[in-house]
Amino acid sequence: MLVKTLFIFLITFFACSEFLLGTSLIQRPIILAPLVGLVFGQLELGIVMGATLELAFIGAVSIGAYIPPDMISGTILGTALAIQAGTGPETALALGLPISTVMLALNSVLSAPIMLVFTHLMDKDIEDGN
């Protein structure tokens, strides 16, 4: 189980590294869910779950001030929990959508204070001439 957890961590790391490695669309559910399914030995089920979640997230594109739900956490956790429970894509969808929405809220609430602290530190450095 530890090896599976490490593989899931690596998949999540590469999915979240879009700003580091460039846009590769690995964060889309149609790519992530089969990778999670492959780790758990259920590639076919991962493909079906990925297609189901992709249909749900197909319009989740960041345009303007809209921030879409966190597809990465919803896909990975929804798929992993559904495979572990021995259920189908309906469970991955039922778990993935609320998880992605909750993660969006957590990212918004937790990242704003951190950015605020760094903004004040940068303002101080600008005033000091650094």
Predicted regions and their residues:
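Long, highly hydrophobic alpha-helical transmembrane signal-anchor segments
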Residues: 57-101
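Membrane-water interface at transmembrane helix exits
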Residues: 15-19, 41, 82, 86, ...
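Helix-loop-helix junctions within the multi-pass membrane cores of secondary transporters/permeases
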Residues: 94-130
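Alpha-helix capping and helix-coil boundary motifs
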Residues: 1, 88-92, 130
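Hydrophobic transmembrane alpha-helices
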Residues: 1-73
